[in-house]
């Protein structure tokens, strides 16, 4: 045991010869007897021994020379301050600071003696036994740097070192953690260097000023410190001497903190915003046969929406109630031959499928982010809901989109590079206009028309239509590029622009998109018109939509007035050669002096009297300045770099 001896003025340190020669037993001596210590200087030696009892009573059993003598000091006698000195292992004590010790029986309230099972027992630290209920109380008094020790069962052989808690940081500040937490034997010289290389300071207060710090240590954990025979001072050279050492794996000088929970909580999937009827509809819609038992519906919901894996079982009751009460589902007989009630299958009511599909799309548009967060595989949402354009061929728009007018969307913005194709007006195919559809009321009575069968390959943005009003407002100096209605088909084509200008059309012929798709972000054509965003439903074509297009950097450039006067056509130079849209028939310019255009094979006799560059769709045109001596006449091109202008 490593402890602090009282000053030499109060305690006499016996040598090894005295240990061997003294008889067994306890020799209790009072102060002032001949064997009492004589006054000496205040510099005491640091020794690997226990305290000396009152007066100073000593117990010197006949033990081997390497065994320490056990003693306990009087509370008023032992004083000192331990520091590492430069001498050969001696530690000097400062008289300015006191180290009050006390006996095991008459100690103050902070003494661990009150935790013993009977204070009348003779003092013997190796024979003290603590029970669990007693030591649990003592554990509250043990603290080092604000942290208590770990405890296991009964403890034996403790030494008490009352220390002020405010000065606990100064207690052996430079000792490495291995010196406290390991029980390995240290070489004498190495351990001496550890002690001498750091200041060992114990700054106590009076015993009645506060609770003390008690260092409990088991008896069998030994270390070897450099010393002469027992009760002698430290020296670099000398024999090794086993003392109980505080640093054991079971009672380390270290902080005892609760272990942090290393397992992070997995993010919980939120409850899907879909109703139970919608979830059942998704399960039945994505089944192979169109009908499922209740157990398979459960499996579908737990597989795609993990919330139901940990949800209370009440959700299964809700599923069963929806199946039995909702008219969108009907029970069908199991064709496998099972007649039990559990073997019945559930299928969709054919008359309610459209309604459920609309409801499904509405919820997806309402909060698509929340829908995907609740799914185990968000990328499967579109496949579970169904093809967004599965109803693209419905009669909502009057006719199916053939050719290039496929499911791909057309965005009336700047086209992608590399898609520039020379574009020429077409002759409208004779035929009645399509009937009125729901979009007519929405768009002011102007319905989109299907392109003529003569040119099925052209984009709907170039399809013919009846006489319409401009889709977008035309500011002063901006006119629509449309021939007057009274022009006969064999009349010359009205002039496009003066020779110094050329017109370019912005379009994207690779794909087409209906106006309904433009208004509905997700492209759902199966929903009612009241499901459209009200901000788009109630807009005025002369206002909000135009402002929105202007916000998208769709700037306008002035256009020269377009007339159908025959005299203006003579100002045009010979037009360039005709170009075609692959793979259908192309429109060729006749090459006559008047700049007339005619379809291929028609010769120079016929020209286009009515030219409509757009119907319900918008086309963006810009004039590009060219030298007045340009040999080529005006032509309509697809150009990704031109600034668009809306025409109707």
UniProtKB/Swiss-Prot annotation:
Residues 271-367 bind DNA. It is found in: Nucleus. One of its GO terms (molecular function) is DNA-binding transcription activator activity, RNA polymerase II-specific. GO terms for biological process: blood vessel morphogenesis; epidermis development; hair follicle development; hemopoiesis; keratinocyte differentiation; lymphocyte homeostasis; lymphoid lineage cell migration into thymus; nail development. Residues 54-67, 398-412 have a biased composition (Pro residues). Keywords: Developmental protein, Differentiation, DNA-binding, Nucleus, Transcription, Transcription regulation. Bone marrow (at protein level). Expressed in thymus and skin. GO terms for cellular component: nucleus. Residues 1-95, 392-432, 457-521, 629-648 are annotated as: Disordered. It comes from the Eukaryota. This is Forkhead box protein N1. The gene is Foxn1.
């Amino acid at each position: 045991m490593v402890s602090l001896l009282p000053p030499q003025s109060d305690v006499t340190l016996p040598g090894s010869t005295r240990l061997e020669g003294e008889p067994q037993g306890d020799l209790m001596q009072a102060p002032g007897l001949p064997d009492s210590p004589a006054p000496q200087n205040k510099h005491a030696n640091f020794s690997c021994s226990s305290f000396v009892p009152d007066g100073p009573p000593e117990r010197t059993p006949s033990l081997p020379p390497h065994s320490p003598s056990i003693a306990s000091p009087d509370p008023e006698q032992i004083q000192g301050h331990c520091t590492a000195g430069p001498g050969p292992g001696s530690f000097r004590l400062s008289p300015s600071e006191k180290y009050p010790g006390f006996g095991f029986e008459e100690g103050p309230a902070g003494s661990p003696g009150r935790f013993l099972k009977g204070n009348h027992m003779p003092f013997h630290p190796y024979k003290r036994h603590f029970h669990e209920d007693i030591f649990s109380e003592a554990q509250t008094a043990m603290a080092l740097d604000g942290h208590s020790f770990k405890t296991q069962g009964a403890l034996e052989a403790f030494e008490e070192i009352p220390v002020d808690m405010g000065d606990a940081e100064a207690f052996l500040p430079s000792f490495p953690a291995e010196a406290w937490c390991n029980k390995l034997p240290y070489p004498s010289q190495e351990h001496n260097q550890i002690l001498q290389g750091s200041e060992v300071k114990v700054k106590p207060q009076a015993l009645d000023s506060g609770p003390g710090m008690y260092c409990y240590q088991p008896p069998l954990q030994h270390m070897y410190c450099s010393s002469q025979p027992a009760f002698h001072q430290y020296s670099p050279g000398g024999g090794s001497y086993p003392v109980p050492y505080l640093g054991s794996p079971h009672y380390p000088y270290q902080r005892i903190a609760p272990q942090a929970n290393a397992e992070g909580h997995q993010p919980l999937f939120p409850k899907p915003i879909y109703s139970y009827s919608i979830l059942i509809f998704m399960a039945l819609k994505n089944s192979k046969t169109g009908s499922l038992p209740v157990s398979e519906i459960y499996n579908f919901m737990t597989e795609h929406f993990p919330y139901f894996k940990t949800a209370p079982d009440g959700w299964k009751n809700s599923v069963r109630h929806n199946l039995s009460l909702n008219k969108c589902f009907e029970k069908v007989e199991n064709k496998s031959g099972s007649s039990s009630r559990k073997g019945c299958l559930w299928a969709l009511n054919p008359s309610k499928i459209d309604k459920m599909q609309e409801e499904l799309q509405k919820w997806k548009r309402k909060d698509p982010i929340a829908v995907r967060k609740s799914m185990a595989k968000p990328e499967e949402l579109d496949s579970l809901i169904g093809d967004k354009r599965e109803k693209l061929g419905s009669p909502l728009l009057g006719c199916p989109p053939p050719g290039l007018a496929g499911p791909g969307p057309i965005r009336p913005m700047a086209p992608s590079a590399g898609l520039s194709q020379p574009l020429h007006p077409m002759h409208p195919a004779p035929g009645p206009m399509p009937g009125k559809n729901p979009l007519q009321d929405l768009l002011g009575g102007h319905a989109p028309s299907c392109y003529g069968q003569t040119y099925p390959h052209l984009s709907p943005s170039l399809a013919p239509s009846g006489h319409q009003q401009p889709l977008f407002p035309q500011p002063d100096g901006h006119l629509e590029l449309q021939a007057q209605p009274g022009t006969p088909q064999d009349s010359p084509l009205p002039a496009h622009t003066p020779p110094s200008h050329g017109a370019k059309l912005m379009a994207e012929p690779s794909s087409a998109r209906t106006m309904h798709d433009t208004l509905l972000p997700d492209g759902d054509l199966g929903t009612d018109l009241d499901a459209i965003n009200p901000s788009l439903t109630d807009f005025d074509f002369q206002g909000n939509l135009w402002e929105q297009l202007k916000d998208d950097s769709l700037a306008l450039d002035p256009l020269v007035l377009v007339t159908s006067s025959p005299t203006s056509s003579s100002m045009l130079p010979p037009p360039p050669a005709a170009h075609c849209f692959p793979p259908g028939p192309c429109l060729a310019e006749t090459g006559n002096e008047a700049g007339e255009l005619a379809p291929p094979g028609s010769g120079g006799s016929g020209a286009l009297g009515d030219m409509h560059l757009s119907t319900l769709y918008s086309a963006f045109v810009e004039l590009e300045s060219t030298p007045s001596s340009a040999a080529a006449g005006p032509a309509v091109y697809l150009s990704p770099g031109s600034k668009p202008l809306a025409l109707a």
